[in-house]
Amino acid sequence: MGNPKAFLTIPRKEAGYRPIHDRILDFSEVEQTLNSNDRRQQASRCMDCGVPFCHWACPLGNKAPEWNDALYKGDWELAYRLLNSTNDFPEFTGRICPALCEKACVLNLMDHEPTTNREDECAIVEHAFSEDYVHVEIPERNGKTVAVIGAGPAGLVAANQLNHKGYKVTVFEARENAGGLLRYGIPNFKLNKSIIDRRLRLLEEEGIEFRYNRQIDVTKLPEGFDAYVVSTGTPTARDLKIPGRELKGVYFALELLSQQNRILAGMEFSKDELVTCKGKDVLVIGGGDTGSDCIGTAHRQGCKSVTQIEIMPKPVEGPEDPKNPWPNWPRTLKTTSSHEEGCTRRWNINSLEFLGKNGKLTGVKVQPIDWKPNPEGGRPLMVEAGEPEIIKAEAVFLAMGFLKPQQPEFAENVFVAGDAASGASLVVRAMASGRKIAAQVDKFLNK
């Protein structure tokens, strides 16, 4: 390593976010960037670990020590080549990955100041695009064809990998554009959609064909292809079937997030179709990242207030989780940029009933609860803790995850990738699955 003692003298420095009073007025990306000198200094903190646990923790097996060292030495092109050797689209993970690698960093064990791998990754790939290190590479064709059903992260990675192996790849997408949850679920303030469009232009120039607005029944796959990759994600959100569910004002989280992203892309919706938080008391049910995205979107739409409730207990505060120690992912309290913008957060809250008047939502009846050990083992028991109460709300967003799809029995030339195989997970895991499945397809077609 270029500077094996840098971690002893250089503290961790994050780029941070734009000021709250500025960022809530638009949907531009909230995260800022460091200058190149500061970025190289941060890369120098990556120590010459005997065992690089960052590599172990990353589903893609990213070579963080190698590209951090190249970045520190100022060899941005080598850093990009090393990064791109394991990660097809680092411009996505560099923005939205939770950075499993950083939690597994040896420096995180020592002083809770791990290397800034995610930010370094984003800086490397953006520098690569600006300096034209990212080239169109049209491979020699091998005469075989592959259909990819679904243009989310897993499908795009599989298509990219197979295209570079010489296959003629056609991607079928049910919606009007590619990206899956990258485009229709993740807000622009975390991932500007121009970043996706830039990559799609490159994929098209390299020979991948995209067919949009094509809803494909996976039991009736289009004919004429040598192999198929099914990467349709997890389209079914978990519902909350309690009294009052039919009231106007109760929505799935993606109804808000997807529509807002489409509006920013130039689509128009009628007043009756519009899902808006403007001037409303908003309640988000579900404590994960999707719920957090709803909070940030609600602020930008001009909500009156936002409350987020979660049925599970409050996670451990602080950097360590005694029940899930390093180098595993710590199940600790996460405060996002959206939470920083203003939000009442509550845990151990069970929703009982949606309340309304004249068919419109006015509030939610909830019950504070506790979780007690189950004497028979297994899942803890939920018990009431106090009296029911009513949370005022004119808009509720259900952000409770997604149901794992049940796939039919497929022929031997059909492969399932990403969330369609595993159930809802991280974008980085879907991308890793896309690479794995592409290798399996290649092996199958060459046996």
Where are the language model's segments positioned?
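Residues forming the flavin
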Residues: 1-37, 42, 121-447
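Ferredoxin-type iron-sulfur electron-transfer modules in oxidoreductases and energy-metabolism complexes
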Residues: 24-42, 63-95, 111-138
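Glycine-rich phosphate/pyrophosphate-binding beta-alpha loops
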Residues: 45-51, 88, 421-427
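Iron-sulfur cluster-binding cysteine motifs and their immediate structural context
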Residues: 48-73, 93-124, 170, 174-177, ...
